[in-house]
Amino acid sequence: VPKFINSSFACIIDRGTHKANNYIQHQMQIFKRNYGDFWVLKCDIRRFFYNIDPNILYHILCKYIGDPYLKRFTKQLIFDGRDIIGDVGIPIGNYTSQYFANIYLNELDQYVKRILKVKFYRQIYG
């Protein structure tokens, strides 16, 4: 299981949109108090679930899965039904899809926090 950044709230036990909203409000108050005025950038990944590359997703998941049986099962979850949904994308509504999407974007989160060193970074998925 990947280590999500502290400000990740989607599909994580005892988190969610309400806690995310409270977290953001609290962080904005701290930022305003310490730094004054600031800008907020709100982005959305258009048709995100429909554009997830299943090969990339599977590669990411395999970093966290050691058991060969579980890898095969995960591969089935991702690739079975490709004839219905096409070459890219994962089904919307499946809990596994929501969790997989969180893991998929965790790569971006880690890059933004660890490589770019963005101090105040927040996202909500799902």
Regions of interest found by a model, annotated:
Residues 10-20:
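Long, hydrophobic, well-ordered secondary-structure blocks that form the structural core
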Residues 1-9:
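Electropositive, glycine- and tryptophan-enriched low-complexity nucleic-acid-binding patches
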Residues 22-125:
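Conserved polymerase palm-domain catalytic core
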